[in-house]
Amino acid sequence: FLLSFDGGPSIVPGNTEALATFLRKQKQAALFFVLGQNLQTRRDKQSMQALRDLYRGQCVGTQGWQYRSHAQWKDWEDSVIRGVARAQSDLPEQYVPLFRPPYGQRRADSPAFFASQNLRVTLWDIDAQDLGPLTAEQSAQRTLTLMLLWRRGLIQLNDSQPKALEVVTWLLTNTAQSGIGWEDCRDFAGQ
């Protein structure tokens, strides 16, 4: 299984720091899908080195410049290009050429564009549903149940949600002696 986080980075200081620090302590390398505008906001408020240290040991893909459905949006390609450029420029060591479309929605004519940009569209298999009304423990139990059913997959959590850290902590604690394996994001990304 691989942990992935959407919609970051959070505001300074925020959930992103807590998640990334916890993952490093657990020797886990997760996949963070960032928004270009959020990365720009971070860049404006902290040093470039602090931003790079934030994602040290993790992988960073993109969700474009802003979190907006691509299904009906004319400027979606520009959003992707700008988001990739910001992530590559700011986080060259952590950047991986993976793109997660906001809401999982993309246009039928998008595959050629993504191929031309050398981006692999990366969805998820298991949604922790940490944005909804579930408690952190309910979200974690739901995730574990789906993990046991699917036996492998990409788990989606939301970077900006305080519940995400609680869910990850619960999952790692409750699977520690189970034999469940956690994939390194660099292996997944082919890096």
At which residue positions do the language-model features occur?
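Active-site beta->alpha N-cap acidic-glycine motif
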Residues: 1-86, 90-96, 181, 188-190
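Divalent metal-coordination and catalytic microenvironments
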Residues: 6, 23, 60, 99-102, ...
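Active-site-proximal loop/turn and secondary-structure-junction residues that shape catalytic pockets
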Residues: 9, 36-38, 66-68, 103-105, ...
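Soluble non-cytosolic domains of exported or imported proteins
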Residues: 10-17, 74-78, 104, 134, ...
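Solvent-exposed, polar/charged alpha-helical surfaces in well-ordered, non-transmembrane soluble domains
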Residues: 17, 21, 78-81, 85, ...
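Sec-exported extracytoplasmic/periplasmic mature domains
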Residues: 24-28, 85-92, 115-119, 144, ...
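His/Asp/Glu-enriched short active-site or ligand-binding loop at hydrolase and phosphoryl-transfer sites
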Residues: 105-148, 180-191
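Catalytic grooves of carbohydrate-active enzymes
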Residues: 144-186
